[in-house]
Amino acid sequence: MVAEVCSMPAASAVKKPFDLRSKMGKWCHHRFPCCRGSGTSNVGTSGDHDDSFMKTLRSKMGKWCCHCFPCCRGSGKSNVGTWGDYDDSAFMEPRYHVRREDLDKLHRAAWWGKVPRKDLIVMLRDTDMNKRDKQKRTALHLASANGNSEVVQLLLDRRCQLNVLDNKKRTALIKAVQCQEDECVLMLLEHGADGNIQDEYGNTALHYAIYNEDKLMAKALLLYGADIESKNKCGLTPLLLGVHEQKQEVVKFLIKKKANLNALDRYGRTALILAVCCGSASIVNLLLEQNVDVSSQDLSGQTAREYAVSSHHHVICELLSDYKEKQMLKISSENSNPEQDLKLTSEEESQRLKVSENSQPEKMSQEPEINKDCDREVEEEIKKHGSNPVGLPENLTNGASAGNGDDGLIPQRKSRKPENQQFPDTENEEYHSDEQNDTQKQLSEEQNTGISQDEILTNKQKQIEVAEKEMNSELSLSHKKEEDLLRENSMLREEIAKLRLELDETKHQNQLRENKILEEIESVKEKLLKTIQLNEEALTKTSI
């Protein structure tokens, strides 16, 4: 970032606001005192500056505008959404500003790295290698920040202090990661440097690796125990920082490393809300693929969709609405389960069968009881009038006289018998027909229940098969994940081994160069001594 600023000539930094004067109008007059009095204005008479114009200006001018004009920078802060700013000043200037007069011999040698090894060893004997300068920097800080791996290795071999903090509470490891000095980072990690120490902004070495999109360094830090959920003072985890800075590749990397997708910043915002506020549709889509919570609210009570609507991010609105529709379809399909419906119908049918079985014996028992009651009434009347024919009614006596000299009760009994016998015959026929109907119903219901039970059994078998398949797939996925982790670890170890080989080669080459230089120095000394001797001899001859 600093390289981009420093690479621009000084003249262009003065011309830039005047070139934009015709477009910026009164906003430029309000923000930049250098543009006042120019007399040019294309903005309305109100004189109020437009925040949307400032955003478009920042997007066009980029980091140049933020560095040259503090009013555009917002005191080192980048706006996200309608409220809640994040301080980006921690990432502005990664390298140290060094003045020669502020450093002693050891610190100069560590910073410049152009001192022979023998001289460094002598310096380390004479002075304290953990000594600090005015900004509380040790020799290890300066060597790591400037990428002088030889000095770093020498200090590590001498067992210097690894986790000393400078004036911004940064360790040598943080400075090496911040300045993207990979060799020094690996050397420090191998010697036990702590990757979870936070600087004054709350950032760890992993935060700076994510900001720089350095996946190799992020892998190495995680391999050596860096905390993937560490939060800085803005409440940003490495994942939230990657989303905020729209670093899609490192966001993918952190998702694979199982970073918490529901982590909240100090304003209660999730990664999805941050991605929506930044207007990054690709990161929003990436997070939606991980089934994140769309309905979560921040401290202001707003959701991701509300931010998308207020910011007029139409593509993101479509993505969120499509995701909600898919989720609703899943929920409806889970609620309307056909297997559960089959179970309910089978239970209802079994209950109906039980009720019909209980009702049929009651009918069977009621009909013979009615016949018994009728027979009892007839027998009682016969007993009453059998011995006393005078007490009979008139219609009965008339019937007796007309009955061929027989008693009056005999024809009456004869006439009553067939009447009493006709009713049971019809009742028996109806009873038998009802019984046949009931048996047919029972058979049909039993057949239906048998069919439904077969269907339930088949459905259960299918469920068991699906569950077995899911279990097998989960086992295979877990096995694949383990294999992937082992491969990643082996890859990292191979990369570290390669870097170690490169370091050894560079050491060997530097040693050879030092030996050659020493030989040249000795040869030069010998030549000088010879010339001095020759000159002395010549002087003695001339004097004689």
Swiss-Prot record:
Tell me the Pfam families matching this sequence. Answer: Ank_2, CCDC144C
Transmembrane segment boundaries: none
Concerning InterPro entries, the annotation shows: Ankyrin_repeat_domain, Ankyrin_rpt, Ankyrin_rpt-contain_sf, CC144C-like_CC_dom
Bias type Basic and acidic residues, positions:
340-355, 364-375
| UniProt keyword annotations, A-Z | ANK repeat, Coiled coil, Repeat
Composition bias, Polar residues: 439-457
Listed as disulfide-bonded, the cysteine pairs are none
Q: Where are the ANK repeats?
A: 135-167, 168-200, 201-233, 234-266, 267-299
Query: Residue ranges of region Disordered?
Result: 332-457
Q: Which residues form a coiled coil?
A: 457-538
Q: Which family does it belong to?
A: Belongs to the POTE family.
Which PANTHER family does the annotation name?
ANKYRIN REPEAT DOMAIN 36-RELATED, POTE ANKYRIN DOMAIN FAMILY MEMBER D
According to UniProt, the name of this protein is POTE ankyrin domain family member B
Taxonomic lineage from the root: Eukaryota, Metazoa, Chordata, Craniata, Vertebrata
